[in-house]
Amino acid sequence: MGEETINSTQNKTRTKTTRPKAVYLWTVSDVLKWYRRHCGEYTQYEQLFAQHDITGRALLRITDSSLQRMGVTDNRDREAIWREIVKQRLKTDIMEIRDMERLNIY
């Protein structure tokens, strides 16, 4: 999350939090950064995400069998990586629902 300083009319300084970039807009580099943060103990598979050009949009569509086809053959490792992907998918869904509620779009 980014932060920017805003000066109000009363010369009080407050901090406004900006939203992170939407996962759908992530580049391969963004996905690799996410991978290192959330799946850092499985470094042996990190390059598979780069080799397969996994962007944010692709990350949210990955399935267990996709991971296996990519080369994540160890069942436990694949399950752990898949769990992190599902968590990210849920976070993305929650943010979208909140946006719709905020804008009263149903």
Curated annotation (Swiss-Prot):
Functional summary from the UniProt entry: Required for normal photoreceptor differentiation between Ras and Raf for EGFR signaling in the eye and for mitogen-activated protein kinase phosphorylation. Probably acts together with Cnk to promote Raf activation, perhaps by recruiting an activating kinase.
UniProt-listed SUPFAM superfamilies: SAM/Pointed domain
Main location: cytoplasm
SMART domains, per database record: SAM
Name this protein carries in UniProt: Protein aveugle
InterPro entries hit by this protein: Aveugle-like_SAM_dom, SAM, SAM/pointed_sf, SAM_domain-containing_protein
Gene name of this polypeptide: ave
Pfam families, A to Z: SAM_2
